[in-house]
């Protein structure tokens, strides 16, 4: 990911304030509600029949935290995302057969949740930097597919 020094500093500063459990659960939950076809990868999560069921589902929240923790690893290794996400890319491609477009969708949902969580502190400039980051992470996760 090509960020200027001030962009990288701003991304890292905001990330240090992110509650991985709260933001991760919200982001994954929204992905499953807004793009319901993504639910097919989460059959073992139980009731995903309504938005309220998805957003209140403890397995969604727990997996969302796990996803956001991995995303945070990427935030701290922006210069080496392909290596950082190599194993996850292989898992999602070879074993789980996840459509790589879902990584882009989740990244965009994450940006929405960050904007919601941080309000005015999530400036247009910071959003632009995070859009670069989520695009880079999505590309790294899709790398095994190429």
Swiss-Prot record:
Which residues does this entry mark as bearing N6-succinyllysine? 17, 59
Gene Ontology molecular function terms on file? haptoglobin binding; heme binding; hemoglobin alpha binding; metal ion binding; organic acid binding; oxygen binding; oxygen carrier activity; peroxidase activity
Specify which residues bind heme b according to the UniProt entry for this protein. 63, 92
> For the Globin domain, which residue ranges apply?
2-146
Q: Which residues carry this modification: Asymmetric dimethylarginine?
A: 104
What tissues is it present in?
Red blood cells.
Residues where Phosphothreonine occurs? 123
Read off the CDD domains from this record.
Answer: Hb-beta-like
Residues with the modification Phosphoserine, per the entry, are 44
Question: Matching PROSITE patterns, A to Z?
Answer: GLOBIN (PS01033)
Post-translational modification N-acetylvaline, affected residues: 1
Which keywords does this chain's UniProt record carry? Acetylation, Heme, Iron, Metal-binding, Methylation, Oxygen transport, Phosphoprotein, Transport
The record ties this protein, via PANTHER family, to: HEMOGLOBIN FAMILY MEMBER, HEMOGLOBIN SUBUNIT BETA
Q: What is this protein called?
A: Hemoglobin subunit beta-2
Where does this protein come from, organism-wise?
A: Tapirus terrestris (Lowland tapir)
